[in-house]
Amino acid sequence: MKRAFIMVLDSFGIGATEDADRFGDVGSDTLGHIAEACANGEADNGRKGPLNLPNLTRLGLVKAHEGSTGKIAAGMDGNADVIGAYAWAHELSSGKDTPSGHWEIAGVPVLFDWGYFSDHENSFPQELLDKLVKRANLPGYLGNCHSSGTVILDQLGEEHMKTGKPIFYTSADSVFQIACHEETFGLDKLYELCEIAREELTEGGYNIGRVIARPFIGDKAGNFQRTGNRHDLAVEPPAPTVLQKLVDEKQGHVVSVGKIADIYANCGITKKVKATGLDALFDATLKEMKEAGDKTIVFTNFVDFDSSWGHRRDIAGYAAGLELFDRRLPELMELVGEDDILILTADHGCDPSWTGTDHTREHIPVLIYGPKVKPGSLGHRETFADIGQTLATYFGTSPMDYGKNML
């Protein structure tokens, strides 16, 4: 029985890539800077001491980081016995965003340039805004700018509740984000508005990767909170991913846990499981792994590393999240059967010590574990697509156009 379990620790980079200068990210290092802060006693809020990740270390995380950066992460064990195969991978795609990283992991790098709304104020074309107001029968809109999602709620949340005007905003990513109150505006109405925005952006040729629904609750600035009902409307990958090939060619199964289905625009997904928060995502993953049959991929995105701690530049929160993940990792490893493979990886970096609030261009860890996986270094990988090609070889689908088999 062949099964693959893919765990994406969203934004868990392990050191700047060779082309990081193109992105202003030279010196970024999500793992390294978190470990450094922990070792220096600068991340003792809600946790304490050096970064403690013994299970990820056994799978080769510290070695992969050393390969990427040339140094051992502060306070971590560079001499621990390694029981998995490990690598550090460079991104071939032109961006450092979520769809590009995930699509490349599945064998389809993004070699075109996304469209962006680069103006920090009055970010969106008036023609687009007018169409959204007309089609969705809106009283107007708020925002129309670059912003952090939590900051803009404090700034505009109360006005949104009074006026019913949705909050439109963007970032350095190829995104159009819409924040609305779940109760006063309504979740279904928000989703409908996002569908309209997705249509207009596609028909208008803006080449925007994602429209993101950002529902929130609360009644005044300071207590607004985003809920777990986020929904991403992505464009479809430009070619069949290894997920699609497993389903189409082998009548296999692909289980999405978390936001995976949204990222791939449901292409190659046979089952969707929603869960919010690190523990809930872990629990849902364990359940699906226990139930998975032959020719199945269980694919989970642990979004909190990115959304709750990376973008918010919360080093202590990120460290605590990693330590929670590591404590629960043996539960996953126990479910890996004789012919199974477990792959732990990331889609980009989001260094919580870095300036600004955006992603960072970094190598990602590729940690592969299974009874038949030979432990040791798989070296520097030129593309995340090596993961997709490895899966294609493992399941016996037709080969991907990019990437090399690592096993």
Curated annotation (Swiss-Prot):
Q: In which pathway does it act?
A: Carbohydrate degradation; 2-deoxy-D-ribose 1-phosphate degradation; D-glyceraldehyde 3-phosphate and acetaldehyde from 2-deoxy-alpha-D-ribose 1-phosphate: step 1/2
Q: Which Pfam families match?
A: Metalloenzyme
Q: How is the cofactor bound?
A: Binds 2 manganese ions.
Residues that bind Mn(2+) 1, according to the entry?
Answer: 10, 347-348
Reaction equations catalysed: 2-deoxy-alpha-D-ribose 1-phosphate = 2-deoxy-D-ribose 5-phosphate; alpha-D-ribose 1-phosphate = D-ribose 5-phosphate
Keywords from the UniProt entry: Cytoplasm, Isomerase, Manganese, Metal-binding
Where found?
Answer: Cytoplasm
Q: What is the name attached to this protein's record?
A: Phosphopentomutase
Q: Which organism is it from?
A: Salmonella paratyphi C (strain RKS4594)
**What gene name is given for the protein in this entry?**
deoB
